[in-house]
């Protein structure tokens, strides 16, 4: 049957004939200088349709040289050299080399095993990993699938098991025996991702509201209880943009003759007497709403939509027979969306949480139901001019087209927290950029306020920040349920996440346009053994930021947790304290509970919401953070959040030598942003300056070395600029003051404190302090926390 247009993705699967070499049973397509398609078909049939993974093979022509050698050939582009003996593909007969690379391991042979490296650094390195379907019930590390990068510079994407998409966009059996895409990008991760997204489709532009804080909990909320919770969040000044209702929104305690209550499509009107009123109230608070779906048990006679669905499918509703859930039947799926899901959306639902946990088999051989559910839900959600979104588990390469990812129900332990940053960043190696995790852990484990606070801090600096937990009354993630400083740390993490939305939304647009996932392994910027082998979990976050998550408890005496990571070349500023670090080395970062290791490279510019605005709208006021020491620019992207957005950009630029900051006039359709906007600009890493060419007020924070200029209101169409006179110099690191604060905080004997301070006071030279510290008769962890600051001061 013909599917509605909304279920037919735009594809362009035919390659330029001039880029295709073909024989009776083989075909080689030069897609880019570093991407080849290699096919073998015993019956001479080759797949020209789009597949579940690959949607586009229509690449611009690239130059190549071809030399025939009997039945074989030699093919050369600027990025690779292929040699083939003309026989059935084999390890000895088909090889690809990387020009200029001498390591024998960099030569790809057909059939080479591409094992994923071990989780921790080790002598064996292969493929650098991609991601996994789920973290359900995981406590710590899980195996991940292959990605597009390896230590040896090549990786393959095997598309032979993919189903083809017919003219209606429906999955169908394919032809051909071997269908392999060979990525030969060396360690150029950005180029590999650009080619991959050109081949499979770009990452979509997420709605702006998806980048705020999500509230979710497996709990049988009544409407009154849920709204009271939202009232409490507002009273506490805790901003949320998404409200997720887990499965208790529908009837779960059903007549046993119908089976399990796991699947449901009808509101539990005992808990929610007026669903439309609840949804309208949540919308009035600026929240988007998602409902949980476990669709595997089909639609049964007690459901509100049963009669309409039965009649649509030609069944007699009076029979009362369950209607099986058949994801492989296009007639059923079209009716399912139209008769079951759309009426709920018309009540005010914004998007679905597709919680499929019933395996990978269907009535179409080779079809994983999860993939088709993700595919159809995402496409359906974009109808009527809406920006599409779904929320589900990963279903293999190409799943980046269906954000947001749901990683599943993890165990609440430090080992789970330790694995998540690495897992999130490594997913970028397969172009998958929008994982959301159960921040704080989902189930089991044990209560540890420090651990949950650190998880919240990680959530701030994650692609998606979604709080979630099981139904246990002891595992809710409301910050006020946690004791001591943890509660305020958690609240501050949520507030900072919300303030980052303008910057995050620009990163969202970059991910869509430039194939640059927001969270990426450090080797994407600085590929070297120290980063390719790194097991620290540190990752790049957007443009110019590096996050080094704290995933182990604090040391008792120092009250600080620590992490060691490679820091790429350049000068890096601590986001919270302003302390500067010199890169090109390993650094160990130690932080008390109140702060987190987030470093900004000199020249980085980050715009944030200024003030206490809890909405996700394009803000009336911005605080623009600038990290001095190098020139930098940032182009802020804003739009109206439509599927075909009216968008505009505002360019911020910092000129280090001149000490000038510029806000350029807006470019594009500015109808979605304020005509006038209040600006404050904070430049970190500068000595105080008494003079500025800006109109407005200037203040200085000596603790962080930050000059803040309040520009007042600036017309978007005009922009503004200011400069410092004389030209700015770097701020004093205030090393002694920082060390005194650390020593004051140490949980050790006072004699040790005095001894340490006396040594520092009598030794003014930084190098002498570093050398002499080791000889002091105090514990090593105390020396280490002081050494971090001394090394930073030795720049």
Where in the sequence are the language-model features?
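A low-complexity, Ser/Thr/Gly/Pro-enriched, surface-exposed linker/loop concept
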Residues: 6-7, 31-70
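Short, well-ordered beta-strand segments enriched in hydrophobic/aromatic residues
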Residues: 28, 36-38, 75-82, 546-549, ...
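Solvent-exposed beta-strand/loop surfaces of large extracellular or lumenal domains
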Residues: 49-63, 574-593, 689-712
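Catalytic and substrate-binding clefts that recognize carbohydrates or anionic sugar/phosphate headgroups
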Residues: 66-208, 217-218, 223-224, 230-235, ...
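A surface-exposed beta-strand-loop module
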Residues: 72-74, 80-81, 700-721
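Aromatic- and carboxylate-enriched substrate-binding clefts and catalytic-loop regions
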Residues: 97, 104, 239-490, 523-527, ...
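Catalytic core of carbohydrate-active enzymes
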Residues: 378, 397-405, 419-423, 427-437, ...
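Accessory, solvent-exposed terminal regions and/or long lumenal/extracellular loops of proteins
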Residues: 602-697, 711-716, 721-795
